[in-house]
């Protein structure tokens, strides 16, 4: 695309527009600059609320993929790609899932996480190649993340995913974007022009983070990774998380700290099993079997441990 063509295309994007409410921001004292930013940030959850039905549709497809042993794969560039990698990296410690269950792919590879590699996003073939290298299957879900909705790396990834037969989801902050037209499900929270024109790490990035939080959290809840509102499948890999695991056993069973620690020791720090053993009196192997029959849903295993 020529420079003139690119400029014309950017002129049409909401996310590249100039914000009339911040035209004088360079003249303001610090506290008023912050108020302007804060006022604009208030618009983000409102925009996300408007696309909850589309987010729910994506969650349902992700749950189906997880139930088949398949994956959720984020594809993005720049800030969008980093947010995908961040969300993916939080899933194993939070929900005790394998590292390859949720994957974040970013244009430019790992180096792009710590330094700008803006040119890496311009080749659609690289998006397709990244998915080829991880062995994309028809059972996987691929989410393309791009504020503009026109990033070539993301477009290439989504087009390849469509060829493979995987479910495709687009997350952009512009209505009727290119990637929205490609994907099976389009999530487009329109947050309006940024405080600083085109700085989409601001409101747009915040909107993306909120949506990604919802997608993985709701999907993990739907496959039994929580009990009540507790992260009972977390991996207690440091002192803080060990303390959190102990508290969860205490909170759900009413036992003492010593009893909770003993139950966690018996179950090799498996919070779900520790809770089930404490509540039902089952031995560890019987509790493990009951949890398996319940499909990993702790509430179901507690209500009928002999099912």
From Swiss-Prot:
Homodimer. It catalyses: N-acetyl-D-muramate 6-phosphate + H2O = N-acetyl-D-glucosamine 6-phosphate + (R)-lactate. Residues 62-225 form the SIS domain. This is N-acetylmuramic acid 6-phosphate etherase. The lineage of its organism: Bacteria, Pseudomonadati, Pseudomonadota, Alphaproteobacteria, Hyphomicrobiales. Pathway: Amino-sugar metabolism; 1,6-anhydro-N-acetylmuramate degradation; Amino-sugar metabolism; N-acetylmuramate degradation; Cell wall biogenesis; peptidoglycan recycling. PROSITE patterns: GCKR (PS01272), SIS (PS51464). GO terms for molecular function: carbohydrate derivative binding; carbon-oxygen lyase activity; ether hydrolase activity. Its EC number is 4.2.1.126. PANTHER family: GLUCOKINASE REGULATORY PROTEIN, N-ACETYLMURAMIC ACID 6-PHOSPHATE ETHERASE. GO terms for biological process: 1,6-anhydro-N-acetyl-beta-muramic acid catabolic process; amino sugar catabolic process; N-acetylmuramic acid catabolic process; peptidoglycan turnover.
């Amino acid at each position: 695309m020529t420079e003139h063509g690119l400029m014309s295309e950017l002129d049409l994007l909401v996310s590249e527009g100039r914000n009339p409410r911040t035209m004088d921001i360079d003249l303001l004292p610090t506290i008023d600059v912050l108020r302007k930013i804060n006022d604009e940030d208030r618009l983000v959850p409102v925009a996300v609320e408007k696309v909850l039905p589309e987010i729910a549709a994506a969650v349902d497809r992700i749950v189906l993929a997880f139930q088949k042993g398949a994956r959720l794969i984020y594809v993005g560039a720049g800030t969008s790609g980093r947010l995908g990698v961040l969300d993916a990296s939080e899933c194993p410690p939070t929900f005790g899932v394998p590292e390859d269950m949720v994957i974040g792919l970013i244009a430019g590879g790992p180096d792009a996480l710590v330094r700008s590699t803006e040119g890496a996003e311009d080749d659609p073939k690289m998006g397709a190649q990244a998915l080829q290298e991880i062995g994309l299957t028809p059972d996987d879900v691929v989410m393309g993340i791009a504020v503009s909705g026109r990033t070539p790396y993301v477009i290439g990834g989504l087009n390849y995913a469509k060829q493979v037969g995987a479910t495709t989801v687009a997350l952009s902050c512009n209505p009727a974007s290119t990637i929205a037209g490609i994907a099976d499900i389009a999530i487009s929270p329109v947050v309006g022009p940024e405080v600083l024109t085109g700085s989409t790490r601001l409101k747009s990035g915040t909107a993306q983070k909120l949506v990604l939080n919802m997608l993985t959290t709701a999907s993990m809840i739907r496959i039994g990774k929580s009990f009540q509102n507790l992260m009972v499948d977390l991996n207690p890999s440091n002192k803080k998380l060990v303390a959190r695991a102990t508290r969860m056993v205490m909170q759900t069973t009413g036992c003492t700290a010593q009893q909770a620690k003993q139950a966690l020791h018996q179950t090799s720090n498996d919070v779900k099993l520790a809770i089930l053993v404490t509540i039902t009196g089952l031995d560890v192997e019987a509790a493990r079997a009951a949890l398996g029959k319940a499909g990993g849903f702790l509430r179901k295993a507690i209500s009928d441990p002999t099912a």
